[in-house]
From Swiss-Prot:
Prolines at the third position of the tripeptide repeating unit (G-X-Y) are hydroxylated in some or all of the chains. Residues 1-183, 199-907 are annotated as: Disordered. One of its GO terms (cellular component) is extracellular region. The modification 4-hydroxyproline is found at residue 272. PANTHER family: COLLAGEN ALPHA-1(XXIII) CHAIN-LIKE ISOFORM X2 (PTHR37456:SF6), SI:CH211-266K2.1 (PTHR37456). Belongs to the fibrillar collagen family. Residues 591-600 have a biased composition (Gly residues). The lineage of its organism: Eukaryota, Metazoa, Chordata, Craniata, Vertebrata. It comes from Macrauchenia sp. This is Collagen alpha-2(I) chain. Signal peptide: none annotated. Trimers of one alpha 2(I) and two alpha 1(I) chains. Interacts (via C-terminus) with TMEM131 (via PapD-L domain); the interaction is direct and is involved in assembly and TRAPPIII ER-to-Golgi transport complex-dependent secretion of collagen. The gene is COL1A2. The modification Deamidated asparagine is found at residue 260. These protein fragments were extracted from fossils. The tryptic peptides required multiple purification steps in order to eliminate contaminants and to increase the concentration of peptidic material. Type I collagen is a member of group I collagen (fibrillar forming collagen).
Length: 907
C-alpha cells in the first residue's frame, strides 16, 4: 500500500502486509508485499519501501505517495458454479399478443366458380347501326350454327355474323379463345372480400335475376334444337364494316324453342348448305329471340346443321329468343392442357362440407376467445374418450419454453404455486383439430323464394370421366332464382366473453340432416375484434351432409386482424377477367380499300374448314365492365345438375382472425317454402376443356359451413378447397336450447377426471332450430382452467344458417402440379382466308457489285481479209551505220594537167 509513515525511510521490508484491503492499496509496491510481482517498477522510486504495512488506516501521513505499483496480475476466474436446478416452470405467461396477420400472399388459385347466379335480364337490344360503307371484310367470325335465317338487316355493329359480309371467301374461323373463366352470371354481387373459397355449399335457391354480366365461359352446349322453318332469305345488305365487338351477352338460360318463322315463298331450291362449323356454344343463356324472317331468296333445303364451332369472340348480345328445349347430353370432351391460373373467381357459395380431414397437429393455444353463447346440448351420445396425448416436457426455469405439443393430460396434480409470469412463449405448432361440437340452433328459415319452373327432364347423359380435381366443372344453367327474403336489421353483437383454454376436441359426430337455409340477412357492421381465443386443436371434419340450399351469403366475418368497419357496399365490381385468350386473334381488318362497289351476288358458302386446335391459353385480360342489363328474357327451364366437383384437399389451417364484435343480428325473415325440385335437365355437351391452369396456391380456407337442404339445385360449382378448421373456443356450459341467455361468467375450472365414455346411443333426430336469441353481453374473462379431458362428441345439431363468408385466406403454398389433362380433340382445319391485298412494289434495289471476270473464251474463227490500209507515215531515221574498214589503195590516177609557167629567171 502506500508507504505508511515510514515514508521514505526504507525499513527492512516488513512482512508482507496483509494485502491491504483491496482498496486503496495502490498496487502494492513491489516491495516484498505479498503483492504480486511488481511490475517493472524498480523499487518504487520515491516511494519508500512500504514500511510495515502500517496500520492499514488511511495510511499515515502518506509519505510521499509512492507511485502505484504496477497492477498485479489478475487471478484466473474461479470455476463456474453448478447450474442451479431449473426452477419449476412458471405459470403459463399470458400469451403474447397475437401477431398481426401477414399480408395476404399472392392470389390463390382461382377458387371454384361460384354457383351460377341467377340469370340477369337480357340487356336491351341495341338498334342496328346504319349500314357502314363496305369495309374491308372483317375477320371472319366462326360460322355460327346454321339457324333460321335472320333478317339480313344492315350489317350493324354486329361484326361477327356467321354469314360473311362480303361474299368473298369465307374467312377462317378465329382461333377459339380459351375458355374464359366463367364470369359471374348476372351482375356479380359485390364481391365479398375474397375469403378462402368456402367449400361450395349446396346450390341456394337462385336469387333474383341480376343484371346481365359478361358472358361467362362456355356453358355446356345444349344440343341444337330443331331448326325452325326457314324464312325468306333476306337480301344481302351491304357488308358493314366490322362493328366493335359487343360486350359479352349474359349467359341466359337455354331459350325455349322459338316459334317457327313463316314459310318464305319458295324460291328455286338452292344447294344444301355446307355443314357449318360448330357454332359458338351459347352461354347457358337464354336463346336470342328469333328475328323475323328476312327476305332472303327462296329458301333452299336446310343445310345439315354443322357441329357447333368453338366459341368465337362473343358478338353483341342477340335478342333473347324463346326458350329452347334442353338438348340431350353430349359426350364429355377430353380435358385440355392446364391453363395458367385464372384469377380467383368470386367466392362460390359454400359447398357441402367435405369428408373430414385428418386431424391436424394441435395448434398453439391462443388467447382465450370470448365465450360464445351457450349452444344447445348436442343430441348424440357421448363419443368415446380420446387417448390422452403425452405430457409436455418441463421448460427451463423462468423462461417459458416454446410451446410443446400438448401432452396427454395426466391426472391433475395439486396445483403448484403460481410462478411468475414468464414472457409469453412462442406458440407451438397447431394441435390436431378437436371434434366439432354440436351445432347451435339454426336461424329461422327465410321467406320462400318463388317457385322456379320445373325444367324438362332430359335423358341423363353418361357421366364423363371426372377431370382432375381442382378444375372447376362447367357450370350448369342456373335454376330460377327465388326472390330474396327481406333482410332483417342486424342485431348488435355483444362483445365476446373471454374464452377458457380449449380442451382437445373429440371426434366429429355424424352430420345431422340439414335444415332449410334461410336467405342471409345483410351483414352487420363489423364489430371491433375481441380477444383472441386460444386455439384448440382442430378435429377432423365430418362427412358432408347433403347439400342444402344456400342462403344468401352473409357478410363476411373478420378473418384477419381487426378490421375497420365495412364501408358501404360499392357498385357492382367489374366482371371477372376473361379466360386466357387463344394466341391467334382473327385477322384485323384490312386497310381501307376505297369505296366498295355494289355488293356482288352472294356466293355459296364455302365449305367449313375443320376447327383448328385450340391455341394456348392467353394471359387473362383485365375484367371488362359489366354489360348493360338486358330486358328480362323468358325464364329458361332449369338446367341439369352437374356432378359435384371432387372435394379439394383442405388447406392448412389459417390463423383464426381475431373475432370482431358481432354486428347486430338482423331479424330473420320468414322461412321460405322450398320450391319443388325442378326436373333435372339433361347435361349439355361438355365443351373441350380449356387448358388446365397451373395449380394455384391453395388459399387458406375458411371454415366449412354446413350444407343446408338441397334446393332446386343447379349443377354444383366446383368444390373449392376446404378451409382449415378454426380452433374452437372453450365451450361454455350448454344453455337451454331456444333463445340464448346472456352467457354467465366462466366458473372456476373443474378438476374431475374424465369419466369413461358411455355406450353410444342412437342419434336423436335433429331438433328444430329455436329462434336466435339476442347476443349476450360479454362475460368477464375467467382464468383459464386446466384443460379438461375431451368429452364425447355431441351429435351434430341441425344445420345452422350459413355463416358469413370468411375473408380471403392467405395464399397457400403452391400445390403440386395436377396431372396432365387429356389432349383436346384436334380441331378442324380453318376455312381458307380471303386473299390478302397485294403489297406495293418495293423500290428498285441498288446495283450489285461487279462480279469477277469470266474465264477466257476460245479463239474465234479467222476473220476475212482487211481492206487496204492507208499509206503510213514516214518512218523515223535509223541509226548511223558502223564505220567501214580501211579500203585498199586505188589505182594510179591519170596524169595531171600541165602546170603553169614558172616565173621568169633572173636576168
Amino acid at each position: 500500500g502506500p508507504m505508511g509513515i515510514m515514508g521514505p525511510r526504507r525499513g527492512p521490508p516488513g512482512p508482507p502486509g496483509k494485502a491491504g484491503e483491496d482498496g486503496h492499496p495502490g498496487k502494492p509496491g513491489r516491495e516484498r508485499g505479498v503483492v504480486g510481482p511488481q511490475g517493472a517498477r524498480g523499487f518504487p522510486g520515491t516511494p519508500g519501501i512500504p514500511g510495515f504495512k502500517g496500520i492499514r488506516g488511511h495510511n499515515g501521513i502518506d509519505g510521499i505517495k509512492g507511485q502505484p505499483g504496477a497492477p498485479g496480475v489478475k487471478g484466473e476466474p474461479g470455476a463456474p458454479g453448478e447450474n442451479g436446478t431449473p426452477g419449476q416452470a412458471g405459470a403459463r405467461g399470458i400469451p403474447g399478443e397475437r401477431g398481426r396477420v401477414g399480408a395476404p400472399g399472392p392470389a390463390g388459385a382461382r377458387g371454384s366458380d361460384g354457383s351460377v347466379g341467377p340469370v340477369g335480364p337480357a340487356g336491351p337490344i341495341g338498334s342496328a347501326g346504319p349500314p357502314g360503307f363496305p369495309g374491308a371484310p372483317g375477320p371472319k367470325g366462326e360460322i355460327g350454327p346454321v339457324g333460321n335465317p335472320g333478317p339480313a338487316g344492315p350489317a350493324g355493329p354486329r361484326g361477327e355474323v356467321g354469314i360473311p359480309g362480303v361474299s368473298g371467301p369465307v374467312g377462317p374461323p378465329g382461333n377459339p379463345g380459351a375458355n374464359g373463366i366463367p364470369g359471374a352470371k348476372g351482375a356479380a354481387g359485390i364481391p365479398g372480400v375474397a375469403g378462402a373459397p368456402g367449400i361450395p355449399g349446396p346450390r341456394g335457391i337462385p336469387g333474383p335475376v341480376g343484371a346481365a354480366g359478361a358472358t361467362g365461359a362456355r356453358g355446356i352446349v345444349g344440343e341444337p334444337g330443331p331448326a325452325g322453318t326457314k324464312g325468306e332469305s333476306g337480301n344481302k345488305g351491304e357488308p358493314g364494316s366490322a362493328g366493335p365487338q359487343g360486350p359479352p351477352g349474359p349467359s341466359g338460360e337455354e331459350g325455349k324453342r322459338g316459334p317457327n318463322g313463316e314459310a318464305g315463298s319458295a324460291g328455286p331450291t338452292g344447294p344444301p348448305g355446307i355443314r357449318g362449323s360448330r357454332g359458338i356454344p351459347g352461354a347457358d343463356g337464354r336463346a336470342g329471340v328469333m328475328g323475323p324472317p328476312g327476305s332472303r331468296g327462296a329458301s333452299g333445303p336446310a343445310g345439315v346443321r354443322g357441329p357447333n364451332g368453338d366459341s368465337g369472340r362473343p358478338g353483341e348480345p342477340g335478342i333473347m329468343g324463346p326458350r329452347g328445349f334442353p338438348g340431350s347430353p353430349g359426350n364429355v370432351g377430353p380435358a385440355g392442357k392446364e391453363g395458367p391460373a385464372g384469377i380467383p373467381g368470386i367466392d362460390g357459395r359454400p359447398g357441402p362440407a367435405g369428408p373430414a380431414g385428418a386431424r391436424g397437429e394441435p395448434g398453439n393455444i391462443g388467447f382465450p376467445g370470448p365465450k360464445g353463447p351457450t349452444g344447445d346440448p348436442g343430441k348424440g351420445p357421448p363419443g368415446f374418450q380420446g387417448i390422452p396425448g403425452p405430457a409436455g416436457t418441463a421448460g427451463e426455469a423462468g423462461k417459458p419454453g416454446e410451446r410443446g405439443i400438448p401432452g396427454e393430460f395426466g391426472i391433475p396434480g395439486p396445483a403448484g404455486a403460481r410462478g411468475e409470469r414468464g414472457p409469453p412463449g412462442e406458440s407451438g405448432a397447431a394441435g390436431p383439430a378437436g371434434p366439432i361440437g354440436s351445432r347451435g340452433p339454426s336461424g329461422p328459415p327465410g321467406p320462400d323464394g318463388a317457385k322456379g319452373e320445373p325444367g324438362v327432364v332430359g335423358a341423363p347423359g353418361t357421366a364423363g370421366p371426372s377431370g382432375p380435381s381442382g378444375i372447376p366443372g362447367e357450370r350448369g344453367a342456373a335454376g330460377i332464382p327465388g326472390p330474396k327474403g327481406e333482410k332483417g336489421e342486424t342485431g348488435i353483437r355483444g362483445a365476446p366473453g373471454a374464452v377458457g383454454a380449449p380442451g382437445p376436441a373429440g371426434a366429429n359426430g355424424d352430420r345431422g340432416e340439414a335444415g332449410p337455409a334461410g336467405p342471409a340477412g345483410p351483414a352487420g357492421p363489423r364489430g371491433s375484434p375481441g380477444e383472441r381465443g386460444e386455439v384448440g386443436p382442430a378435429g377432423p371434419n365430418g362427412f358432408a351432409g347433403p347439400a342444402g340450399a344456400a342462403g344468401q351469403p352473409g357478410a363476411k366475418g373478420e378473418r384477419k386482424g381487426p378490421k375497420g368497419e365495412n364501408g358501404p357496399v360499392g357498385p357492382t365490381g367489374p366482371v371477372g377477367s376473361a379466360g386466357p385468350a387463344g394466341p391467334n386473334g382473327p385477322p384485323g381488318p384490312a386497310g381501307s380499300r376505297g369505296d366498295g362497289g355494289p355488293p356482288g351476288a352472294t356466293g355459296f358458302p364455302g365449305a367449313a374448314g375443320r376447327t383448328g386446335p385450340p391455341g394456348p391459353a392467353g394471359i387473362t385480360g383485365p375484367p371488362g365492365p359489366p354489360g348493360a342489363a338486358g330486358k328480362e328474357g323468358i325464364r329458361g327451364d332449369q338446367g341439369p345438375v352437374g356432378r359435384a366437383g371432387e372435394t379439394g384437399a383442405s388447406g392448412p389451417p389459417g390463423f383464426a382472425g381475431e373475432k370482431g364484435p358481432n354486428g347486430e343480428a338482423g331479424t330473420a325473415g320468414a322461412p321460405g317454402i322450398p320450391g319443388p325440385q325442378g326436373i333435372i335437365g339433361a347435361p349439355g355437351i361438355i365443351g373441350i376443356p380449356g387448358s388446365r391452369g397451373e395449380r394455384g396456391i391453395p388459399g387458406v380456407a375458411g371454415s366449412v359451413g354446413e350444407p343446408g337442404p338441397i334446393g332446386i339445385a343447379g349443377p354444383p360449382g366446383a368444390r373449392g378447397p376446404p378451409g382449415a378448421v378454426g380452433s374452437p373456443g372453450v365451450n361454455g356450459a350448454p344453455g337451454e336450447a331456444g333463445r340464448d341467455g346472456n352467457p354467465g361468467n366462466d366458473g372456476p375450472p373443474g378438476r374431475g377426471y374424465p369419466g369413461n365414455s358411455g355406450p353410444v346411443g342412437a342419434a336423436g333426430a335433429p331438433g328444430s332450430p329455436g329462434p336466435v336469441g339476442p347476443t349476450g353481453k360479454h362475460g368477464n374473462r375467467g382464468e383459464p382452467g386446466p384443460v379438461g379431458s375431451v368429452g364425447p362428441a355431441g351429435a351434430v345439431g341441425p344445420r345452422g344458417p350459413s355463416g358469413p363468408q370468411g375473408i380471403r385466406g392467405d395464399k397457400g403454398e403452391p400445390g403440386d402440379k395436377g396431372p396432365r389433362g387429356i389432349p383436346g380433340i384436334k380441331g378442324h382445319n380453318g376455312i381458307q382466308g380471303i386473299p390478302g391485298i397485294a403489297g406495293q412494289h418495293g423500290d428498285q434495289g441498288a446495283p450489285g457489285s461487279v462480279g469477277p471476270a469470266g474465264p477466257r473464251g476460245p479463239a474465234g474463227p479467222t476473220g476475212p481479209a482487211g481492206k487496204d490500209g492507208r499509206i503510213g507515215h514516214p518512218g523515223s531515221v535509223g541509226p548511223a551505220g558502223i564505220r567501214g574498214s580501211q579500203g585498199s589503195q586505188g589505182p594510179a590516177g591519170p596524169p595531171g594537167p600541165p602546170g603553169p609557167p614558172g616565173p621568169p629567171g633572173p636576168s
